[in-house]
Design a protein with these regions (language model features):
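Solvent-exposed, acidic/flexible segments
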Residues: 9-10, 47-50, 82, 86-89, ...
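Stable alpha-helical elements in mature extracytoplasmic
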Residues: 10-13, 53, 92, 206
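Histidine-anchored nucleotide/phosphate-binding helix
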Residues: 13-21, 206-210
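Active-site segments of SGNH/GDSL-like serine hydrolases
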Residues: 21-44, 246
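Extracellular/periplasmic envelope-modification machinery, especially enzymes
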Residues: 88-194, 199-212, 216-217, 223-232, ...
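Short, well-ordered alpha-helix to beta-strand connector turns
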Residues: 24, 61, 214, 238-240
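Catalytic His-Asp segment of secreted/periplasmic serine-dependent ester chemistry enzymes
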Residues: 36-37, 42-45, 52, 58-129
Length: 258
């Protein structure tokens, strides 16, 4: 059964693609499964599936689907939060990069770090059984350390990890949390490729793992930005790769998309 909300998301995405990337052959989409898809759910509740959602959109939008659901399992998500864990996403990042014919960067110099203290996600204190706290880990490397992130809203530049934002909300460590439009520059890139990612909050932790394959990555969250506003702010280069990276939860709740 197709929800009205999914139809709304389809129309919203189609409007964006027609406005900015008419006729592009480089538009890709990955649908992020809901954590509930990997859990026992209460009787009578069936979470919307990533496969059906992707199939529906693939039939109606000019996109190539990159299926990442088979790469994910319950342990790839936080215990206390609906989001996925960045340190578990290397295979997802590699699969997406390869599907877009992007060079997969050398990750041999990666280091796994962790924020100090426990991570209490949005489920904390709201479940019948007490949950074990999470640790919020993040991946660093000389390549990621050299990347700069420009925030169009605040006209400021920082890194891919925002430790100040993380003090208030730990998951906002990744790209500073909810942001309408960011531009990541990778001075270590061995090419001039550009990637444009339309994403929700799940993209915050995955996009840094894709950035190494490109000179420039634009990160767009249309939940905070109307269509016409994007054209006033920046022009996207022709021939760029476009990735629609959305969770089932957002696609099935199109009211959040503008």
């Amino acid at each position: 059964e197709i929800s009205c909300s999914l139809v709304g998301s389809e129309m919203c995405i189609r409007d964006r693609l027609e406005a900015y990337f008419p006729g592009s052959e480089h538009v890709y989409m990955s649908v992020i499964p809901d954590k509930a898809a990997f859990m026992e759910t209460p009787e009578g509740y069936t979470p919307a599936g990533a496969q059906e959602t992707a199939d529906y959109l693939a039939q109606r939008l000019p996109v190539e689907i990159i299926d990442i659901a088979p790469l994910l399992a319950l342990e790839d998500y936080y215990r206390t939060d609906p989001h996925w864990r960045q340190e578990r996403l290397s295979a997802v990042a590699q699969t997406i990069s390869e599907a877009m014919d992007a060079p997969v960067p050398d990750m041999t110099e990666e280091t796994l770090c962790a924020l100090a203290g426990e991570f209490h996600g949005s489920y904390w204190g709201k479940t019948a059984e007490p949950l074990t706290a999470d640790v919020l880990s993040y991946i660093t490397s000389p390549l990621l350390d050299s990347c700069t992130v420009y925030d169009y809203e605040t006209d400021s530049t920082g890194g891919v990890y925002d430790f100040t934002a993380a003090e208030k909300s730990p998951y906002d460590l990744f790209l500073g949390g909810p942001k309408a439009l960011l531009r990541i520059e990778n001075p270590a890139a061995n090419n001039d490729r550009t990637l444009i990612v339309f994403r929700d909050s799940f993209g915050s932790s995955l996009v840094p793992l894709l950035a190494g394959s490109y000179r420039t990555v634009y990160v767009v969250d249309i939940r905070y930005m109307a269509t016409d506003a994007l054209a006033r702010v920046t022009e996207f280069p022709e021939g760029a790769n476009v990735l629609l990276l959305y969770s089932v939860a957002v696609l099935q709740n199109s009211i959040t998309l503008k």
